[in-house]
Amino acid sequence: MSLQRRTTLTKYLIEQQRENNNLPADLRLLIEVVARACKAISYHVSKGALGDALGTAGSENVQGEVQKKLDILSNEILLEANEWGGNLAGMASEEMEQFFPIPANYPKGEYLLVFDPLDGSSNIDVNVSIGTIFSVLRCPDGQQPTEQSFLQKGTQQVAAGYAVYGPQTVLVLTTGNGVNCFTLDRELGSWVLTQSDMRIPVETREYAINASNQRHWYEPVQQYIGELNAGKDGPRQADFNMRWIASMVADVHRILNRGGIFMYPADKRDPSKPGKLRLMYEANPMSFIVEQAGGAATNGEKRILDIQPKSLHERVAVFLGSKNEVDRVTRYHLEKKS
């Protein structure tokens, strides 16, 4: 009986290292460690109430958001998995106010890892897809990073990815050479390549936005959504469907597969905040992935990957997905500004 040939994450990364000479061995090892940590997080997520990890932890993170037990556990899993491998100079997380330097008793490497350990955690208790988002940067200051070391434009990312913990657990990854999706084989414990060179359809009839905030949106977003909702009788002469999961990884994963636009705009409630999503560990890695898949990502005025971060937990408006739609809503913002 012949065995079905399957490409695992390890095999894929080694082949990339051999063929392109643009994937250093220590970056390959770092990605594999992050992937193993995502497997561990997936296990704890799948236990649900049986694992005593549901509910809140009685604390808040630096964003002022109530932490779930799984938020804290996922953060600890990623820290512990990556601190001793010798590939990193430091890490930063949504759940920590300051960056995490590699302890002195461990070897250090040339990379920085930035992550949202459990995106969409408000959905944990109701069993809706959640995930992990991560970004890898080179440390410009050798092995002794400061917070400034992390504040690099998204164009400087050397790898980015996300895991979705849903009906299947999948890992979507880019190292700057296209986007690939791996599905976790729970029986064998390995990530198996299931989608190669993913591409976002240019034309789309779906969009994702939290419509409950409509009364707070600025005029360019009101105009754009108004056109979509007008359907065949409106200026777009087509019917559009809205989908909103309230989990960025789930919404973006759907768009990556089916096309569409994901929007989390700034609004009038707090003009001092340019948006809700964090630039370093949400918008940047997702924008890198989307652009590698042929899509686009802006903050309404400029390409997200060109934004110079000013702080570790900086927020930004996000419009990403199928290029034609992102270009249109960005044009509305620029026309209003001018």
From Swiss-Prot:
Keywords assigned: Carbohydrate metabolism, Cytoplasm, Hydrolase, Magnesium, Metal-binding
Amino-acid positions noted as binding substrate in the UniProt annotation, renumbered to this chain: D119, G120, S121, S122, N210, K276
Subcellular compartments: Cytoplasm
Main location: cytoplasm
Chain positions recorded as Mg(2+) 2 binding sites: D116, D119, E282
Co-factor note (free text): Binds 2 magnesium ions per subunit.
Catalytic activity entry: beta-D-fructose 1,6-bisphosphate + H2O = beta-D-fructose 6-phosphate + phosphate
Class in the EC hierarchy, top level: hydrolase
Biological process (GO), any one: fructose 6-phosphate metabolic process
Enzyme Commission no: 3.1.3.11
One Pfam family per UniProt: FBPase
Matching NCBIfam families: PRK09293.1-1 (NF006778), PRK09293.1-3 (NF006779), PRK09293.1-4 (NF006780)
HAMAP family: FBPase_class1
Family statement: Belongs to the FBPase class 1 family.
The protein, known as: Fructose-1,6-bisphosphatase class 1 1
Organism per entry: Paraburkholderia phymatum (strain DSM 17167 / CIP 108236 / LMG 21445 / STM815) (Burkholderia phymatum)
